[in-house]
Amino acid sequence: VLTFDQSFMGDSAGFPGHLSSPDIFTENLSAAVDFLGLQPLVDREKIGAIGICGSGGFALSAAQCDTRIKAIATLSMYDMSTAVRLGMDKVEIQKAKEKMSQQRWIDAENGYPEYLPFFPEQPLDTVPEGLQEPDAEWFRFYAIKRGHHPHARGGFTTTSTLAMMNFRLLDYIDEISPRPILFVVGDRAHSRFFSENAFKAAAEPKELYVVDDAEHIDLYDRRDRIPFEKLAEFFSNRM
């Protein structure tokens, strides 16, 4: 098993930190396959990918073009290229683009990009009152001891969103077939529609597996909710 932080994220290298790139994040999955395939103990015909949240979308995106990925499972999948446009009409999208485009001038003059972290530097004891969902849910994981980490304070550089708005991740999801896809999602996940929409767009073989009594973040760390046996069965039988 190989796990890694995306470029510019966590303990991985890359400047500027907290940059978000649909191209690089997708390419990182293929680079991981490169590395695995060079290990003497690895069967190149049995390399699969598991992606959680946004990494689920990037894993699917990589599998669209990299046929070396033989099976893909996602948990609480987020399609970030769709997420950045949610709730905005065309006028609002244009205003957002204009604001971020102007921010590029400021970033260029400063010599570094604006980054506004979403979560506190130190973990909170409780989630602040008054937060709306899904922000409150993010705080229930990343802002308290449950999931807080100094290298995971949320968000990306302000202008990173422009790239996500410009390139769609899953336009060719049907081309993953005949390789199998397993979408795992909580029944109470605010992000459930991402998996459901991707499931509809994907070709067979595919499966949508709904976990009872689970919200989005529960599939990050709750061992009583993550369907380990289902995942093990999927990869054992499909590769």
Region roles according to the model:
Residues 5-10, 78, 212-215:
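Short beta-to-alpha linker loops that shape the active-site pocket of alpha/beta-hydrolase fold enzymes
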Residues 9-45, 221, 225-227:
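Catalytic nucleophile-loop/oxyanion-hole region of alpha/beta-hydrolase
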Residues 36, 56-67, 198:
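Short glycine-enriched nucleophile-adjacent loop
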Residues 60-140:
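Alpha/beta-hydrolase-fold enzymes
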Residues 87-88, 155-173, 190:
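Active-site nucleophile elbow and catalytic-triad environment of alpha/beta-hydrolase enzymes
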Residues 176-177, 182-185:
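Short beta-strand/loop motif that positions the catalytic acidic residue
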Residues 187-206:
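Conserved loop-alpha-helix segment in the C-terminal half of the alpha/beta-hydrolase fold
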Residues 212-239:
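Catalytic active-site module of serine/aspartate enzymes centered on a nucleophile-bearing elbow/loop
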